[in-house]
């Protein structure tokens, strides 16, 4: 049928010949139509980059909104709701044939369950740290996890660290010191009970330290365990969220206060709908991050994706200044800038390592990984 159509386009109709001049002109070849606008839009590299950055900011801001309530203490319940929302969302996408992942297998679940426990420790301590710290400080301190992961790779997987990577680590530590100093300085100089504010910050720093340890343990453990399961793309997300739901349900009912008075404090009538909506949206945002990161890698490149992950630190930190009452001072802004530069230097160091021979290069930066694995690593750092 297509061949017939092409033939007809160049057929000369005899009754249209100019018999006087004995000349004739064939109709102009038909212009090949472009792809549909939707396909062109989907392949535009700007759109997936903006979508990835937006979903990262959305997740952080929604979590902070829920946790910033003065009396919110149902962290395990929040994480459970997010896991349930995530499972419902990806299962719906699978049923609609938008994504694919393997069906549940009990043997694979047993192999993956220890990683799920590490994940629960990571997301719980992360929620506690975000509850006590501002988004900019939380984002800056999250960079320290990169250092722990890098040296974990050196110790357990025989990797190495380049000079540029070490320089980026130094900038990360410096930005964290500046951020902590700016926070404590603002707490001491501001009106109100300075001692209570400093105590709150110290609690946040302790939770942040524990979170960095849990996050690095999770990433390193997942790297080793994934060789046994050969999980791809959304497989990891499916098992992580599915296996964490029963554990989180047990923890929330055993360790958290479910009295009517405490529920009223956590979900005041005036803000109840907004809090529940934010909890659901934060669960969906984790799906958005995985999907948009895979989209970003497919449309652009892994190099561009690495740079986007580094540049994404700045808008996430700025979102805390815009949407919440994070102090805007010269030291706090300086900490954000230094942390932003450290992320760029680290991304450039990773790109240069990837361009070199594989001998003696950190495994975390050299071997190809799936888009979901890469996005998970970056989302943990954001």
Curated annotation (Swiss-Prot):
Region entry Disordered: which residue ranges?
358-382
Transmembrane regions: 41-61, 72-92, 111-127, 135-151, 161-182, 201-221, 234-254, 275-295, 304-324, 328-348
Q: Which GO terms describe its cellular component?
A: cytoplasmic vesicle membrane; endoplasmic reticulum membrane; Golgi membrane
Q: Where is the composition biased (Polar residues)?
A: 367-382
| Membrane topology (Cytoplasmic) | 1-40, 93-110, 152-160, 222-233, 296-303, 349-382
Kindly report every residue range on the membrane side named Lumenal: 62-71, 128-134, 183-200, 255-274, 325-327
Q: Spell out the subcellular localization from the entry.
A: Golgi apparatus membrane; Cytoplasmic vesicle membrane; Endoplasmic reticulum membrane
Q: Print the keywords alphabetically.
A: Cytoplasmic vesicle, Endoplasmic reticulum, Golgi apparatus, Membrane, Sugar transport, Transmembrane, Transmembrane helix, Transport
Q: Name one GO biological process term.
A: transmembrane transport
Membrane topology listed for this record: Multi-pass membrane protein
InterPro entries (UniProt xref): SCL35B1-4/HUT1, TPT_transporter
Task: State where it is primarily located.
Answer: Golgi
Q: What does this protein do?
A: Involved in the import of GDP-mannose from the cytoplasm into the Golgi lumen.
Summarize the subunit comment.
Homooligomer.
Family membership, please give it. Belongs to the TPT transporter family. SLC35D subfamily.
Q: What is this protein called?
A: GDP-mannose transporter 1
């Amino acid at each position: 049928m297509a061949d017939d159509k092409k033939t007809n386009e160049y057929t000369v109709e005899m009754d249209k010949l100019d018999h006087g001049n004995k000349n004739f002109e064939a109709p102009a070849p038909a212009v090949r139509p472009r792809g549909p606008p939707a396909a062109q839009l989907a392949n535009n590299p700007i759109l997936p980059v903006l979508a990835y950055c937006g979903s990262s900011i959305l997740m952080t801001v929604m979590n902070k909104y829920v946790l910033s309530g003065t009396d919110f203490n149902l962290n395990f319940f929040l994480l459970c709701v997010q896991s349930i929302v995530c499972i419902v969302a990806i299962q719906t996408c699978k049923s609609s044939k938008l994504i694919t992942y393997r069906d549940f297998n009990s043997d694979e679940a047993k192999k993956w369950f220890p990683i799920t426990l590490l994940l629960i420790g990571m997301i719980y301590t992360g929620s506690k740290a975000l509850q006590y710290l501002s988004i900019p400080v939380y984002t800056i301190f999250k960079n320290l996890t990169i250092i722990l992961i890098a040296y974990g790779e050196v110790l357990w997987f025989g990797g190495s660290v380049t000079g540029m990577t070490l320089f980026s680590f130094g900038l990360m530590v410096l930005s964290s010191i500046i951020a902590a100093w700016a926070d404590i300085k603002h707490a001491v100089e501001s009106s109100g009970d300075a001692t209570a504010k400093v105590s709150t910050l110290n609690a946040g720093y302790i939770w942040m330290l524990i979170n960095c340890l849990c996050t690095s343990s999770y990433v390193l453990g997942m790297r080793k365990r994934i060789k046994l399961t050969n999980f791809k793309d959304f497989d990891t997300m499916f098992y992580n969220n599915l296996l964490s739901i029963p554990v989180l349900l047990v923890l929330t009912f055993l360790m958290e206060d479910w009295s009517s008075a405490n529920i009223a404090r956590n979900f005041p009538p005036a803000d109840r709908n907004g809090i529940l909506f934010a909890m659901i949206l934060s669960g969906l945002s984790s799906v958005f991050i995985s999907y948009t990161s895979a989209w970003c890698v497919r449309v652009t490149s892994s190099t561009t994706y690495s740079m986007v992950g580094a540049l994404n630190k700045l808008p996430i930190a700025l979102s805390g200044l815009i949407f919440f009452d994070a102090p805007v001072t010269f030291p706090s802004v300086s900490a954000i800038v230094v942390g932003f530069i450290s992320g760029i230097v680290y991304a450039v160091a990773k790109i240069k390592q990837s361009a070199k021979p594989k001998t003696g290069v950190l495994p975390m930066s050299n071997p190809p990984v799936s888009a979901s694995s890469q996005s998970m690593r970056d989302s943990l750092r954001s």
